[in-house]
C-alpha cells in the first residue's frame, strides 16, 4: 500500500482497533501475571513440617519407657525385618526373643533402633525431654520432600555449615528408561532443575566447601556451564567407573562417568589429603630409563643386571628394605612362579594371613605358585635362571583425577544407580570427622550411609516412596551397625540418633487453598475499581486465610492440613513447633512439655545471630495470659533478665517487654515472626 492510497477514515478505524487490542491485551497480560506471581509465591513459600520424628538406639532411651516399647507390635515387626530379632536366642533360656518382647531382651540388644513414629505423642515427648542437646545428639537429618522445598526449609538452620556437597542428579537421557525417577527432561528443563537447586543450596555451604556433581556424557557440558555460571571455580573432572554396559546397544560401551569437583573462587583442594588404599596398588616393573653405575642389584641372592639404557630405581640398601617388607618380588620368566623373601612358603602364608591388608598379592590365586625363600641364586625349580623384578607401590600414593580403580556403583540395596560406598568414602576423605555432608538427590542414601560410618554429620533429601522403601530402612540399618560396604574399615557405631522430617509440598499448598469471594464489596457503579481488583489483587486477597491464618495459633498443637497419601487427601497434623524452629534457624538444646501437654518449651541458640532463645508454645484455649504469667513464675523465667536474648510466645500476652540494643523487642509474637519468615524473599 502506498501513502497516497490511505484514506483518513480508514486510518482512524484501524487506530481504534489497535488501541482496543492494546487495552484488552494489557488486561489479559495483567490477569495472567497475577496468577503467575501467585504461583511463584506458593512455590517459594517455606513449607510446613507435617512430621518430625527420631530414630534412636535403645541405649539412649530411658529404661522407664521400656515397658511401652515391649508392647509395641509395629516396632517389633520392623526389628524382625531389619535386624532379624526373631533369630536371637538367649543364654540358658533367658533373654531371647519372645512375643511380647521383654525388658531383659531390650537391655541385651542396645543397638536396636527405635523409631518414635510408632509411639504415642506422650512417649515421644518423654524421650525428647531426656535429650540434653537435641540437635547435637542427632548425627543427621533425613528429609522426605521435593529437594527445592527442602533446601529452602533448612537454609536458616544450616547456613554456612556444609563442608562437602555431593549430588548424583538424574541423568538426562532424553528418553524414558527403567528407573524409579524421570530421565527424559528437555535440556532447558534439566538445566533449570539443576541450576535452581545448586543456587538454593549455596547459602548453606561453607566458603571452604567442596562441590561434587556426578553426571554422564549426556550432561557433562551442561554441568560445567551451570556450576561456572553460579560463580564456582573448576578444580577437576574426575573419571569414575560406570561398570554398567548397555545391553543391546550398537554404541561402543561406556565404561566411565564424570565427577566434577568445584570450589568457591580463590579456594584450592588439598590434593595431598586423600591417599589410595594399599589394596588399590598393583605390582609394577622396577626399571627406569637411563643408565646408573653400578647397574646391578642383588635380589634374594640373585644379582641382576638391567637391560642397556635402563636402571633399577633404588640403591641396594633400599632394595634390601623393600625385600624385607615384601614390596619387591621376583617372577620367573618361564613358569611365572613368584618369589618373596621368607624362610619358607609356610612362613610366608602365615605372614600374609596375619597382616591381612598390610600387602596385597594381586596375582596369587589357586593356579599361581609362590615360594617364600632367602636365596634364588640357583634359579627357579623349573630350571630357568631369569627373573623379572616387580615392585608393589607404597601405600601412600596420592590420588589424581582417575578413580577407575574403585567401583562407581553397587547393588546392595536394590537401586539401579546406587553409588558405591567405596566411591563415597574417597569423596568424604576430603573432609574431617564431624564435618557436615549434604546430598539432596538422595537415591539409595549411599552418601549418607558412608558419612555416618565415617563419623560425619549429614543431611539428605529424597521424595516419594523411595524414602520409606529404601532410605529409611538403610539408615536405620547403618545406625544399628550393619556391616556392608566400607563398614569393616571403620569402628562400629556404638550408639546414636538421627532425625527425619516430612514437608508439606507445593501440591499440598494448592489443595489447601480456599477461595473466599468478595463480590459484595463492590458498588454497582464502581466498575473501574472492580476491574482493577479482579486483574491485580483477587488471588492474594481471596486466598489470604489459606496461606496464613491467625486461628492456627490459638491451639497450634491441633493445626492440620490436607495432604496426599495413597492418592487420597487426608487430614494431617502439622508440627508447628518444628516448622518454627526451622524458620528461625534454631539449634535446639531442649524441648519439654508441661501442663498436660498444653505448653511446649523450646530452648536453643539461633544459628546465624547466636541469640540464646526461649520459645513458648501454648494452647491459648487452656492457657490464658494469667496462666502464662504463673507458668513464667513457676519456671523462674524473666523477660527482663539476661538469661535469654529472645523470647517468642504465641498469642497476645501481658509479659513485660524490653527493647534490645539492636532496637528490637525481646519478647516477640510467634505469629508475627512466623509470617515474616515463611514468606520472605531470599
Task: Map each language-model feature to its residues.
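Conserved P-loop NTPase mechanochemical-coupling segment
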Residues: 125-142
